[in-house]
């Protein structure tokens, strides 16, 4: 199965640290950005801090990346977003469609991309609003020593085969995506690697499968999946056998 690796411009945006959950989660300009790290312990993160003199402050971190899908032809039948984890695994994660990087990968990631999520709704859960690109991983099921698999949705597969660029935001699921304020003073985070890591051994990538084409029926009782050629002709080049 072929792989698509994230562009080196990937990175993470941290919200401003403010006195309300809504102010952090729905930050429209972001507080800071990092596109040069090879790894971050706050690949996805939500935090609640105790403030001096009483009260609390909040912070949210989201990661963004994009993939060049212009070379894909045919139907994408399966896709898995693979993120190399590390350090922390007490958070949660989901991949959603994003309009960061100018919407086409032609613009550098900026703090204003913090809420560049398709279907983003200020003050509301993203459930039913965002275009989900993966399943969710929650709690300690996140590996800190290997790759984590996020199974791609039909929306991801469709965009991979139809669009030249696929842009992804990876965000905390339990609190950020669902818009549920962090209750206790804590940081809930997953650690993860970016494309700036030397080589590709820990880079984010999408593993995908292109559906087979050509003759797709049984021949003399043998399943098409087990047939490579008929009379020396590759099945990918056959539409009919004896007119069928």
Show the residue positions of the predicted features.
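Boundary/junction segments of secreted and surface-exposed precursor proteins
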Residues: 1-24, 214-222
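Beta-strand-rich interaction/scaffold domains
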Residues: 5, 87-164
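Proprotein-processing/basic-patch segments
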Residues: 2-13, 59, 155-213
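Intrinsically disordered, compositionally biased repeat/linker segments
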Residues: 210-244
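A short beta-strand-loop element at or near the start of a globular domain
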Residues: 24-88, 201
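Residues within well-ordered beta-strands of beta-sheet-rich folds
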Residues: 64-68, 78-84, 149-157, 167-171, ...
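Short, surface-exposed beta-strand/loop "edge" segments at domain boundaries and coil↔beta transitions
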Residues: 54-56, 89-92, 102-105, 173-189, ...
